[in-house]
């Protein structure tokens, strides 16, 4: 893990890390979460519609060139309803990736639906 992180940090010397570099760091750390030889990592990366790096994170030969990315599910996070053209471009991108990534998550729809699915009598847990 440390060697992989060092490569990323050295490549970003003098600038901020980009979204894909941060995603890869998260995945490399996730590779270390193993108990009894079983991976115990569950990761999701939410990205903006305009983030081309994350859109293409699981395209091409990623499973051999960047196998750490298999640890995470990647989803686009809409904050409002996209226009039909933007939405269809994202579906085409999902098809062309051949990986089923990026998924689609709508933050506002989730906020509207959450009260119907939450028992407010509980005072524990997350989310």
Residue ranges of model-derived segments:
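Conserved catalytic cores of very large enzyme subunits
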Residues: 1-127
